[in-house]
Amino acid sequence: MTRTLPAGLTVTARVPASSANLGPGFDSLGMALGIYDEIEVRTTDSGLTIRVEGEGADDVPWGPSHLVVRAIERGLEHAGVWADGLDVVCRNVIPHSRGLGSSASAVVGGLAAGCALAAKLDESLATAADELVQLASEFEGHPDNAAASVLGGIVVSWTETSAEAQAEVPDHGRVYRAVRLDPHPTLRPVVLIPEVRSSTAHTRGLLPESVPHGDAAFNVSRAALAVVALTTRPDLLMPATADRLHQAQRAPALPLTTRWIDRLRAAGIPATVSGAGPTVLALGTGEFPAELRALAAEEGLRVVEPGLAEGVLVD
């Protein structure tokens, strides 16, 4: 039986951005970044009100189709509760359509807020992190960004479609899993964010249906090396961020991104496409060179040093 939440319950979720792939770890490796959206939710007697501030305020729907609202309602449904009304405020800082996991952050924040409201009614309804990863990944279709925003740090994620997995989540048929890795303490991510946007669906459409065995073997070795480089051996980040499966294939759609990745790597700075782009992710341990920062600004890229982040927090 579905239980109804009383009016007046309030929660606030603070959810980080994320960068996926990290070079060779296509749809598997992810990293939480210290750029945050905030979602405030209050239960009311009836209806839905939503206000969006900041990034994307003029582009997203202010109604029940808003991704955050859908995620809140899914979180409530998962916990077996309902609210007669909701007042939702989204304060957005994460750039949209830039390869920084803004949709995953919206989903994770909404789910976490919905589940936290249920836990205020009954602590036994609290949702575990692995459940949040599953629920958020069902929205996204893959777990790399979602898992990073849930767990924080660096994540390795994967999808199971076995008969056992299908029995575990019969309504979805896929089990999404992730483990968190603690990044090396000297790791300093830098993101170079262009003004232009990129469509994940479009850039995914540029990928071939199959790849040569040699390229697959190359990426397996580099993805394994990336786990080592990101956690214990940052001196190996240059070879560990090399890729043959997706970046070159997407290059025609991301000329500015590709030029900057080549420029940074030529300067000895490990760099990759952040997610589907167009943001560039640089992974180093020292100061980002001032001359490159100035050149990036001249070419319309915003340079941000966000730091690594912990996962979603709810008050």
From Swiss-Prot:
PROSITE patterns: GHMP_KINASES_ATP (PS00627). Keywords: Amino-acid biosynthesis, ATP-binding, Cytoplasm, Kinase, Nucleotide-binding, Threonine biosynthesis, Transferase. It catalyses: L-homoserine + ATP = O-phospho-L-homoserine + ADP + H(+). Its EC number is 2.7.1.39. GO terms for molecular function: ATP binding; homoserine kinase activity. Pathway: Amino-acid biosynthesis; L-threonine biosynthesis; L-threonine from L-aspartate: step 4/5. It comes from the Bacteria. GO terms for cellular component: cytoplasm. ATP binds at P95, H96, S97, R98, G99, L100, G101, S102, S103, A104, S105. Pfam families: GHMP_kinases_C, GHMP_kinases_N. The keyword Kinase applies. SUPFAM superfamilies: GHMP Kinase, C-terminal domain, Ribosomal protein S5 domain 2-like. It is found in: Cytoplasm. InterPro entries: GHMP_kinase_C_dom (IPR013750), GHMP_kinase_C_sf (IPR036554), GHMP_kinase_N_dom (IPR006204), GHMP_knse_ATP-bd_CS (IPR006203), Homoserine_kinase (IPR000870), Ribosomal_Su5_D2-typ_SF (IPR020568), Ribsml_uS5_D2-typ_fold_subgr (IPR014721). Belongs to the GHMP kinase family. Homoserine kinase subfamily. Catalyzes the ATP-dependent phosphorylation of L-homoserine to L-homoserine phosphate. NCBIfam families: thrB. This is Homoserine kinase. It comes from Nocardia farcinica (strain IFM 10152). The lineage of its organism: Bacteria, Bacillati, Actinomycetota, Actinomycetes, Mycobacteriales.
